[in-house]
Amino acid sequence: MSDPRAKGGKGGAANAKNEPKKQTTQSARAGLQFPVGRIHRHLKSRTQNHVRIGAKAAVYTSAILEYLTAEVLELAGNASKDMRLKRITPRHLQLAIRGDEELDSMVRATIAGGGVLPHIHKTLIKAPSKKKALE
């Protein structure tokens, strides 16, 4: 007869061979590049009254940060390619963020070394005269 205490539990092939179980990070489990554990630690330390932070909150926050970073880097990379450069500069980040309406409304910060967007008001541009247009 089998022992009634042998049901379930964590006894398996890995424990029978005395091999330690391979650790996987929370980021790897979630399929993310950003550090879920570190973000969870920062979320816990930054809250008032030290309220509890769920594990899914850190995963969700990491996913949002990773997505926004990828979006900005893709747009900045396109801006640097348009200028035929291989390195992303603060100017490229500025052009990428200010060129996208949603990112522009979300990022209201000043980017150091980003410069300004070129813009000339329509009333300041001289209309071509009719004499030059006829010639």
Swiss-Prot record:
Acetylated once deposited into chromatin. One of its GO terms (biological process) is transcription elongation by RNA polymerase II. It is found in: Nucleus; Chromosome. The modification N6-acetyllysine is found at K10. Residues 1-33 are annotated as: Disordered. PROSITE patterns: HISTONE_H2A. The keyword Cytoplasm does not apply. One of its GO terms (cellular component) is euchromatin. It comes from the Eukaryota. SUPFAM superfamilies: Histone-fold (SSF47113). InterPro entries: Histone-fold (IPR009072), Histone_H2A (IPR002119), Histone_H2A/H2B/H3 (IPR007125), Histone_H2A_C (IPR032454), Histone_H2A_CS (IPR032458). Keywords: Acetylation, Activator, Chromatin regulator, Chromosome, DNA-binding, Nucleosome core, Nucleus, Transcription, Transcription regulation. It holds the Pfam family Histone_H2A_C. GO terms for molecular function: chromatin DNA binding; identical protein binding; protein heterodimerization activity; RNA polymerase II cis-regulatory region sequence-specific DNA binding; structural constituent of chromatin. Variant histone H2A which can replace H2A in some nucleosomes. Nucleosomes wrap and compact DNA into chromatin, limiting DNA accessibility to the cellular machineries which require DNA as a template. Histones thereby play a central role in transcription regulation, DNA repair, DNA replication and chromosomal stability. DNA accessibility is regulated via a complex set of post-translational modifications of histones, also called histone code, and nucleosome remodeling. Belongs to the histone H2A family. The nucleosome is a histone octamer containing two molecules each of H2A, H2B, H3 and H4 assembled in one H3-H4 heterotetramer and two H2A-H2B heterodimers. The octamer wraps approximately 147 bp of DNA. H2A or its variant H2A.Z forms a heterodimer with H2B. H2A.Z associates with the VPS72/SWC2 subunit of the SWR1 chromatin remodeling complex. Also interacts with RBP1/DNA-directed RNA polymerase II largest subunit. This is Histone H2A.Z. It comes from Mycosarcoma maydis (Corn smut fungus).
